[in-house]
């Protein structure tokens, strides 16, 4: 199984470490040819406006979007969630997204870097529940609204939606890769494995 990590900026190495610890073969994705033969891709956290600009600069945005539309499994964290969203409450000037995930997202919903925090979050999808996932919220977004094809899979005690699934897309506001809690990475890899088996 070959899975990619969009390696334009942000928390690339942490996701590579998680995936490789779980036995996946990984590839850094920077240009369109890096997408060839992937069975899944991670869009990591970082700075969503920089991610957008670099993806367009390296001509990877459009082929990536096309593959996701065609069903390529995606796991996105923090800025990755923002980058997939159809709508942003508070976009930066000129900011573009892939507009693939039917959600409204508020950037930096908890404030600045100083207001970053760690907590635990219960995550549920594909018939499984992962209690107490160790989650790092770093200038994190939240989902303020979502369409009928989107399922909320994680929320904070105050009701803020911090994880969603839409078909082949799983997106979280937080960073499990920063905490060493790799259960969601493993569950995502399991979903890819099931998809591959069905395709055989």
From Swiss-Prot:
The active site is at residues 78, 175, 177. SUPFAM superfamilies: Class I glutamine amidotransferase-like. GO terms for molecular function: glutaminase activity; pyridoxal 5'-phosphate synthase (glutamine hydrolysing) activity. L-glutamine binds at residues 46-48, 107, 138-139. Pathway: Cofactor biosynthesis; pyridoxal 5'-phosphate biosynthesis. Its EC number is 4.3.3.6, 3.5.1.2. Keywords: Glutamine amidotransferase, Hydrolase, Lyase, Pyridoxal phosphate. GO terms for biological process: glutamine catabolic process; pyridoxal phosphate biosynthetic process; pyridoxine metabolic process. Catalyzes the hydrolysis of glutamine to glutamate and ammonia as part of the biosynthesis of pyridoxal 5'-phosphate. The resulting ammonia molecule is channeled to the active site of PdxS. Belongs to the glutaminase PdxT/SNO family. In the presence of PdxS, forms a dodecamer of heterodimers. Only shows activity in the heterodimer. This is Pyridoxal 5'-phosphate synthase subunit PdxT. The lineage of its organism: Bacteria, Bacillati, Actinomycetota, Actinomycetes, Mycobacteriales. The gene is pdxT.
């Amino acid at each position: 199984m070959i899975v990619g990590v969009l390696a334009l900026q942000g928390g690339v190495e942490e996701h590579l470490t998680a995936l490789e610890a779980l036995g996946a073969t990984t590839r850094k994705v920077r240009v369109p040819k890096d997408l060839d033969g992937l069975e899944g891709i991670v869009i990591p956290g970082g700075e969503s406006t920089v991610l957008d600009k670099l993806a367009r600069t390296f001509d990877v945005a459009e082929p990536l979007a096309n593959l996701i539309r065609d069903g390529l499994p995606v796991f996105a964290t923090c800025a990755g969630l923002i980058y997939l969203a159809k709508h942003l409450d508070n976009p930066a000037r000129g900011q573009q997204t892939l507009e693939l995930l039917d959600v409204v997202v508020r950037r930096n919903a908890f404030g600045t870097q100083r207001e970053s925090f760690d907590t635990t979050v219960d995550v549920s999808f594909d018939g499984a529940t992962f209690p107490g996932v160790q989650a790092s919220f770093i200038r994190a977004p939240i989902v303020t609204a979502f369409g009928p094809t989107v399922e909320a899979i994680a929320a904070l005690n105050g009701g803020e939606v911090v994880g969603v699934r839409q078909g082949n897309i799983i997106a979280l506001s937080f960073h499990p890769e920063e905490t060493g809690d790799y259960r969601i990475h493993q569950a995502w890899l399991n979903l890819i494995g099931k998809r591959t088996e069905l395709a055989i």
